[in-house]
Amino acid sequence: MDLTLLWVLLPLVTTAWGQYGGYGYPYQQYQDYGDDGWVNLNRQGFSYQCPHGQVVVAVRSIFSKKEGSDRQWNYACMPTPQSLGEPTECWWEEINRAGMEWYQKCSNNGLVAGFQSRYFESVLDREWQFYCCRYSKRCPYSCWMTTEYPSHYGEDMDMISYDYDFYMRGATTTFSAVERDRQWKFIMCRMTDYDCEFENV
């Protein structure tokens, strides 16, 4: 390749990479998504909701054995595209109990727009609830599960959705009675751009 052409193209590539952070999202829109933006202290309950019309696209967490084998959490949200429209209803799902493995998707074809959690000293674990929002009568399809986050118990966790066409619908978790920690697999789905008749897919 001609070096002159390379020097002309390099600033353009660098600018595009800086604008999108390599993730398919404008990185600057992740507000407070850093090490000092935790939504909880260790052993503390929390409730986190995305602003209206936004859904969770990133989850970050750090583990502390000495602080009750607990984690601090942080989330990032992004607005949904105009093709989905506005949320027509939002709700808290059923509680997933501490000390147990669980699998849960938002009911009623909802998308994850928040998390709520409470810590239990007796089991050194948390119970969890999803905050879900439904968008008209849109239905999920082409669903898949992410790899495990974190890769090993006790490690830091940093899950970012790389594809704007996929939305978080839920998760499945394992629980280690020895490590007192969880591994998460997030359920990601596309959503139809038209209404459908299925009430819960």
Swiss-Prot record:
Disruption phenotype: Mice have reduced skin elasticity, a decrease in skin-thickness, and lower collagen content in the skin. The modification Pyrrolidone carboxylic acid is found at residue 19. Induction: Induced by cell quiescence. Residues 70-186 are annotated as: 3 X 6 AA tandem repeats of D-R-[EQ]-W-[NQK]-[FY]. Residues 19-186 are annotated as: 2 X 53-55 AA tandem repeats. Sulfated on tyrosine residue(s). The keyword Secreted applies. The modification Sulfotyrosine is found at residues 23, 162, 164, 167, 194. InterPro entries: Dermatopontin (IPR026645). This is Dermatopontin. It comes from Mus musculus (Mouse).
